[in-house]
Amino acid sequence: NIGMTGCFPDHASADKLAEELSRYGINIVRMHYVSHRTPKEGYPFFDSFIEPVQLERFDYLFAKLKEKGIHIYFQLNIARKVSWVNGFVNAHLLPYYKNGIDNVNERMVYLQKKFHGEILNHINPYTGIAYKDDTSISMMELANENSIVHSWFSPKHKFTALVEPYKSEIIEIWNDWLFDKYGDMETLRTAWGKGTEANADEILPKSKNFKKKNIDW
């Protein structure tokens, strides 16, 4: 792994790193936590995760590794930080590293897609190739350890103690999915009861949207 600030070394350090890895016979590295480390100067736009100085250093390191025949395992999303600056209310109270919630929050999903599009279409000035077309990228990871199920059961993520407005948002999404799949409470109880009386409060948290669909439970 090359992680966090290690993804953005100065040119001299990048030269040395590529040389050392090659000397030890390493032919693939994982670029880890690329989008996690916030630059000192901040990001140029509220909805951007690309900062010019970091990007230039990343480009240079990538090119030097490529020159040495070292392939890249490119990790795009891990622990991406969000804050009130990006328009997220109570962001500092969200679960550890925002894992799980960024699978369902529309703005978080939008920002991930935006970042993916920007970085993959970016032409590295040192290689002359866009990352999406560079064959030295052997693997690409869209999201790392980001299962909503894992976050639900992990005490570290505290997903069951979401703050507003995120709690209501995910309840609405969950209830809409249940309604679309089962249509009524009797079918829902049968599917989830497994031969016993299903607890509706646990399966179906109360929400405005489900009440609007006139389902009496």
Question: What do these predicted regions represent?
Answer:
Residues N1-W217:
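Active-site mouth of glycoside hydrolases
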